[in-house]
Structure formats: C-alpha cells, structure tokens
Design a protein with these regions (language model features):
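Catalytic phosphate/nucleotide-handling subdomain of diverse soluble enzymes
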Residues: 267-306
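Short glycine/serine/threonine-rich phosphate/pyrophosphate-binding segments
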Residues: 18-21, 43-46, 73-76, 99-103, ...
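Carboxylate- and glycine-rich phosphate/diphosphate-binding segment that chelates Mg2+/Mn2+
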Residues: 150-256
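N-terminal small/polar loop signature for handling phosphorylated ligands or for N-terminal nucleophile
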Residues: 42-115, 229-239
C-alpha cells in the first residue's frame, strides 16, 4: 500500500531564523502580508520582532489581532472578511495553535469560497485549491501547526471542536526560531510541551504508524523528554530542544494521525475552554495504560527514548509501566495537575464521551474503543 507523507516546502530552524521571512517573501513575489497574531503577543512585543523584519525590508503588511484561544467559526468568518478588505496576498501566522489554525482556515476559505460556512471543512475537507500562502512562525513549542495538515475550529453552536484535515492548508514556509518562544511563561511552556509529547507518543502507537513516522516520533520523544524541564526554566538549551522536538513530532503525526487522548481533550476545550496541552497531559498516562495491550513492544521504545535504564531486560509488564511512569514523572515535574477533578463535571460525561467518540482522532487509536469505555476513562480521571 502506498504511504503519503506531506511536509513544508521550506523550513528554517535556529536562533535568528525570522530574518528569513523577508528572504522568502521577496523570492516568492509576495506583495502584502496579512499578519495573524493574538493581542498578548502584540502587547508583549513578540509580534514586533517579525514586524521589524518586514519594516527593515520595506515589506507591506496589515496586522490582524482578533485571534481567540480555541478559535471559533465566527472568528474565522471575521478574519476572511478582514483579509479581503486589507488587499493582502499572503498570510504570516505568528503564535501558537490559535493563530495558526485561524490563518489556515482563512487561507483555505479565501481560495475555496464554497466552504465559507466553515463547518463544512470538518473532517477530511474536499477542497480543490491550496490555501493562500502561509508563512508560519510558532511562538510555542507544542502544537507544531506550522508543519501539519490539520487545524481545529470550535463550533460554539454545538459546543464541539471540529478537526479539519486538509493537505491544502500546510504552510509553504515554517520559521522555527527559539527566540520567538523565550517569553512563554512556565505554565504555557509546560502545557504546550506536554502537548508535543502527546503528539509524539500517540503518533508512535497510532493505527496508521509506519517506519518513516516511527523514526520521527521516537526522536521527538527523546528530544522532548531531555528538553522540557529546561525549557520550563527558560534555559537556551531547553528552548532550542523543544523548538526542534515539537516540530519533528509534527512531521510525524500530521501524516499518520493521533488517538483518543486528543479525542478526549478536544471536548474539554470546547465545553470548558480547558487549555489543550493541559488536557492532553492529564489524560495521556491513563489512556496509555488503556492502550497498552494493543501496542506490542512500542512502550519499551518509548521508555528507552525517555531515558529509562535497563529496558532491554524488562518484562512486557515492566516496560509498559516504566513508559507510563516516565510520562507521569515528567508531567509532575513541570507542574501539570494530576487529574480532571477541577475541570470536568460528572453530569457532562455522557456528552464528553460521545463527543470524544465522534472526534476525527478516535479512529487512529490503536485499541478499538466505545462510548462506554471512554466514559469510564473520564470517570477515572475525576
């Protein structure tokens, strides 16, 4: 069977990489940028780092800051109109998943106006044309939206997150500069970092995993496990490691999918506005235990990649427990809560479980599941 793999056309990595934004814009003949960035990044001067590069090279732009956490259908529609009004011809997305997802949806709809309702983009979208060109500049080390073919938009009318999968939305250029991530506070660094680890682990054990994706995911697990604690303390080595590790994880999972950790996290964001990385981090160890019977020897590889010693001599039960324990220890060390007690209301579990089962990530789970089993997983976490 043929295996498809989609990546950015061009990516830049390392300190000072944002200078290459101008190089790419000029080389591609772009005229005016529609810069998507959230108000906090603008307030704290993070966005200005990119705007300075544009100004120094006399490149025109329009800044769009109506970016919300967990962007909604309405946010996207507003952005589409703003793009049209600004007379721009490409997008620069600066931020975490929210800015990236908003930019992707705007770019897709501009060139595929038949999807202007936004909701018809859910699932594998049958668009005909590539999005308006996107240059993606992440400011968090977690979502890897700069290298994925996925984006998530919230449908507030149904209290659910729509996972949209479309090869046409991948940014043409990714600029992964750790200096753009240095202002992240500890909590956000921890949450987005655990999101990246979840991508790597779920991608490694997903039903669609194969040799090429396994290579990326194992390396990502190794780098993230070594780097996240340092990144939370804002060390240069930690920041650089996380910038690379989360990108490598994105290269993998974007092409093979995820599992029910993400399926269960998405409705928490839609219903309670729970930060995505926090939800993933809390859910991950419990779902790893649940999925263990369907993972062969892969937990041995995960434990080894996370630095556990003696895995070659462990029994299956021992290395599976070691992998889960290593995830729990990392999560605890970076300050992630241990459960969902302060987030989930028990009366909401039937809705959450059904939403998780219906989520686009669920079919990738290595173990067959049901609404009832997902419900029990939620209950075990409160």
């Amino acid at each position: 069977m043929a295996q498809r793999f989609i990546l950015n056309g061009t990516s830049y990595h390392g300190k000072g990489a944002i200078k290459e934004i101008a190089t790419e814009a000029v080389a591609r003949g772009f005229k005016k940028a529609f810069v998507c960035s959230d108000p906090d990044l603008i307030k704290f001067g993070v966005t200005k780092k990119v705007l300075d590069v544009l100004d120094e090279n006399n490149l025109a732009y329009e800044v769009y800051s109506d970016i919300k956490p967990n962007p909604t259908v309405e946010n996207v529609k507003t952005g589409v109109q703003a793009f049209k009004d600004a007379g721009t011809d490409y997008l620069i997305a600066i931020g975490g998943g929210s800015s990236m997802d908003t930019a992707k949806a705007i770019g897709i709809i501009i060139n595929n106006p038949e999807f202007a309702d936004v909701v018809s983009l859910e699932g594998v979208a049958p668009t005909k044309k590539p999005a308006v060109p996107i240059i993606a500049v992440p400011t968090t080390a977690g979502t890897a939206a700069e290298v994925t073919i996925n984006y998530v938009i919230t449908d507030t009318s149904k209290n659910r997150k729509m996972v949209c999968v479309d090869p046409h939305d991948i940014p043409v250029v990714a600029v992964v500069d750790p200096d753009m991530m240095s202002s992240m506070p500890k909590g956000l660094t921890a949450a987005t970092g655990m999101d990246a680890l979840t991508h790597a682990i779920e991608g490694y054990i997903t039903a669609g995993a194969w040799e090429l994706s396994d290579m990326f995911h194992l390396k990502a697990i190794e780098i993230i496990s070594k780097s996240l604690r340092g990144a939370v303390e804002n060390t240069p080595e930690g920041r650089e490691g996380m910038a690379l590790g989360q990108y490598i994880a994105g290269m993998g999972f974007s092409n093979v999918g995820l599992g029910i950790v993400h399926s269960m996290a998405h409705p928490l964001g839609a219903l309670y506005d729970t930060p995505h990385g926090v939800a993933n981090a809390i859910i991950l160890p419990t779902v790893m235990e649940y999925n263990a019977p369907a993972t062969g020897e892969k937990y041995r590889d995960i434990a080894k990649a996370m630095g556990v010693k003696g895995t070659d001599d462990m029994t299956q039960e021992e290395y599976r427990k070691a992998a889960v324990d290593a995830v729990k220890k990392l999560s605890q060390d970076v300050g992630i809560p241990a459960d969902l007690k302060d987030i989930v209301k028990e009366e909401d579990i039937p809705f959450l479980a059904q939403s998780a089962y219906d989520d686009a990530c669920r079919p990738g789970n290595p173990r067959e599941t049901s609404v009832e089993e997902i419900s029990e997983l939620y209950k075990s976490l409160i």
